């Protein structure tokens, strides 16, 4: 693919636009160099999980649950709720959690809590067991307030003047 036909701009959602980059010369690397790049990319995924976890107590749990819904073939992808959840998940991926990557305010989901409860309850049992819950109801009791209640974790970092930075 020539440089002139390569599309650097990719997907756009919410207030974000994804950019793509060319890895010039990647094809010329030796097999051992390509393996090294592969294992570095695997390490970045672990680092991403660490960052996501550090940005909020429930961020990994939320991301893994949203990913399970996103990849479940039984979920109807044509609904407005699914499309809203897809944008929310992409924002979670980009920001490593449920708060804006620089504004630190919590994302407002564009899918209903009723829909979310229904699709999570319909997931295979091993999905919620893998994240440490014995039932979908127990998982939803933790997730729904964090995702849907604007008073729960409204900001990742509060730097407002006069506010107790530790307590808030």
Region spans (language model):
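N-terminal helix-rich structural modules
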Residues: 2-168
């Amino acid at each position: 693919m020539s440089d002139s036909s390569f599309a650097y701009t990719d997907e756009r959602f919410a207030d974000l636009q994804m950019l793509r980059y060319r890895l010039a010369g990647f094809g010329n690397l030796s097999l051992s160099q390509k393996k090294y790049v592969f294992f570095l990319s695997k390490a970045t995924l672990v680092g991403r999980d660490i960052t996501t976890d550090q940005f909020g107590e429930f961020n990994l749990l939320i991301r893994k649950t949203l990913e399970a819904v996103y990849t479940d073939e039984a979920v109807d992808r044509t609904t407005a709720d699914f499309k809203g959840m897809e944008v929310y998940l992409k924002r979670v991926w980009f920001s490593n959690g449920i708060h804006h990557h620089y504004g630190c305010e919590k994302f407002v989901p564009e899918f209903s809590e009723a829909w979310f409860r229904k699709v999570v309850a319909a997931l295979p049992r091993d999905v919620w067991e893998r994240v440490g819950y014995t039932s979908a109801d127990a998982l939803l009791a933790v997730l729904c307030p964090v995702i849907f209640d604007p008073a729960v974790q409204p900001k990742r970092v509060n730097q407002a003047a006069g506010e107790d930075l530790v307590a808030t």
